[in-house]
Amino acid sequence: HCYEKETVHSEKEQDSRLAAWPLLVADENPIEDLMETYRMMFPGKKVTPCIFPWIEPENKIVELNRYVLDCAEKHNIPALLLALPHWSAEELEARLIERKFNGIKVYLSFAPSYLPRDEVRIYDFLPPSQLEVLNRLGLAVMLHIPRSGRLKDPVNLGQILEIEQNYPNLKLILAHVGRAYCEEDVGDAFEILKKTERLTFDFSANTNAKVFEWAINAVGPQRMIFGSDLPITRMRMRRITENGKYLNLVPKGLYGDVSDDPSMREIEGEEADRLSFFIYEEIKSIREAAINTRLNKGEIEDLFFNNAHRMLGLS
């Protein structure tokens, strides 16, 4: 995510269908901060980010996208357009072609506000008319799937399979390994999705090595891509799971009062002192999954760079 403070600030209350804790990390992440974060966290490594806006506020979508495009052109890096479902096919195509985006980012909070969280379907914020445009242009869509059932939800699985079958030329990426942060989020999803030929998962903001292992075994390392989800993964935290739910362990007081957030738990003392960055926890879990699935050096290079480079049309 790449955004300026004055653009994302809004008096409007956050959509209740969204997790609240990611907003605790940074109220701004301009391109300069993003590039410096990569330089500091990955010394000696060349990182090519694919940038897109923060997902709110909706009434500043034009400014959010314009800033990202300006940054992408200045730094010669790929970018995704934050797209709204009410845009016509013609409007979406014009924005994509004129401004040279590599695809779109869509989000469940753009579904009609009258729909409760568990009644939102993928097509409510990624309509078929827009899928047809992406298919015709051969572009990518970064999809954060809805519903509390996450990856195992049968409605989600049904629509993912429909998209795979009906739009063979677009590049569908399921963010956060389909939001399967816990093993209980998976169900029989990978048994179903291993029949797909193009569907891709990204690892971003997920630290479940077992889920990563299942995903790699289901679709292969050529359909997995590394993502940072910065600035969210700049958090000092470690994720655990309890009773089928994820919990973010953070140093007491570092992110203000988190007592009312069921996804957060504060810790103190030596345990808190040992906490690293969320992004390092993600990479540690990728490493564990890579060892357990016996990936070779070339396959690891693919999932950290080559696969995304190819999918975004950069190779």
Write out the residue ranges for each language-model feature.
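Active-site environment of divalent metal-dependent phosphoester hydrolases
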Residues: 3-6, 56-59, 86-89, 110-113, ...
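Distinct, well-ordered alpha-helical segments
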Residues: 61-69, 89-97, 150-166, 181-193, ...
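Short, flexible/disordered intra-domain loops and linkers
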Residues: 7-24, 113-121, 151-152, 183-184, ...
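Active-site gating/metal-coordination segments in enzymes
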Residues: 48, 56-149, 195-200
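Proline-centered flexible-loop/turn and helix-kink motifs
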Residues: 43, 73, 168-169, 194-197, ...
